[in-house]
Amino acid sequence: MQTFAEISALREQIKTFKREGRRIAFVPTMGNLHEGHLTLVRKAREHADIVVVSIFVNPMQFDRADDLNNYPRTLEDDLSKLNGEAVELVFTPTPEMIYPEGLDKQTLVEVPSLSTMLEGASRPGHFRGVATVVTKLFNIVQPDVACFGEKDFQQLAIIRKMTTDLAMDIEIIGVPTVREMDGLAMSSRNGLLTIDERQRAPVLARTMRWISSAIRGGRDDFASIIEDASDQLRAAGLHPDEIFIRDARTLQAVNTESTQAVILMSAFLGKARLIDNQVVELVKDSKEEVDSIESESENSH
């Protein structure tokens, strides 16, 4: 495994691999790697000869300075895990390398509509920061394929649209969410939880399953479902951030043409903002009567 901090050195090595006809897969991360990230690496291995992983905590996508400062950084442990997966190349740039003139003078990439709805509405600039850094990393690595987790459902949709709109010749592969034994979606932010908070955290996934069951049972009173779900989270000590029920394909309101809904949830627990999602098949009778209701839960953080 080779580790590069300099863009030019990484590019030279990738050019060598490409001259040899090697297929390149890319997994961008912000470090603090867990089994979910390693699952992405293994999926990347299935689609390419060479796997490149980046570790970069992107300041442009954080909307709160304390969140950026608190984000876990575990480079030595991350490199050990990647070495265990036989990753060929690891890219570990500094913010100064990615944004040499600072964030204020950086050319920006923004995917309209998708970036400003749902989570993007409450986190202005977040998805612009994601799209910008992913575009830059794609230009540096020049991968044939890139793997992203489905846990960040809206982010994956944005990256798919971005690569299509900008005619990037990169195959985007979504990888299902990896969960702990108790159902909690694996996340680097889980490390911010205290022992007590960690015991309560699976309530997010359980509440999501309750919503899914209600929808599969034919309920289409989404506003009431969201209100009840918010109450369940509060009862367990979580602070609901956002709960949406949307068309899984368009992320717009569910309508009579929708065949699948996606439940998008986030909640605060201590210092951590937890997110999760689940796709649900819509009951035909329910679809025909749905009033395209969707609502954001009361933000009580």
From Swiss-Prot:
| Gene3D superfamilies, sorted | HUPs, Pantoate-beta-alanine ligase, C-terminal domain
Q: What is its main location?
A: cytoplasm
Q: Does the keyword rRNA-binding apply?
A: no
* Any one of the GO CC terms: cytosol
Q: Could you tell me what reaction this enzyme catalyses?
A: (R)-pantoate + beta-alanine + ATP = (R)-pantothenate + AMP + diphosphate + H(+)
Q: Which Pfam families match?
A: Pantoate_ligase
EC numbers listed for it are 6.3.2.1
Pathway info: Cofactor biosynthesis; (R)-pantothenate biosynthesis; (R)-pantothenate from (R)-pantoate and beta-alanine: step 1/1
Task: Tell me the keywords, alphabetical order.
Answer: ATP-binding, Cytoplasm, Ligase, Nucleotide-binding, Pantothenate biosynthesis
Q: Which positions bind (R)-pantoate?
A: Q61, Q155
Please list the GO terms describing molecular function.
ATP binding; pantoate-beta-alanine ligase activity
SUPFAM superfamilies the record matches: Nucleotidylyl transferase
Query: Does the keyword section mention Nucleotide-binding?
Result: yes
Which residues are noted in the entry as ATP-binding? 30-37, 149-152, 178, 186-189
Query: What biological-process GO terms show up in the record?
Result: pantothenate biosynthetic process
Subunit and interaction comment: Homodimer.
Instruction: Name the chain's protein.
Output: Pantothenate synthetase
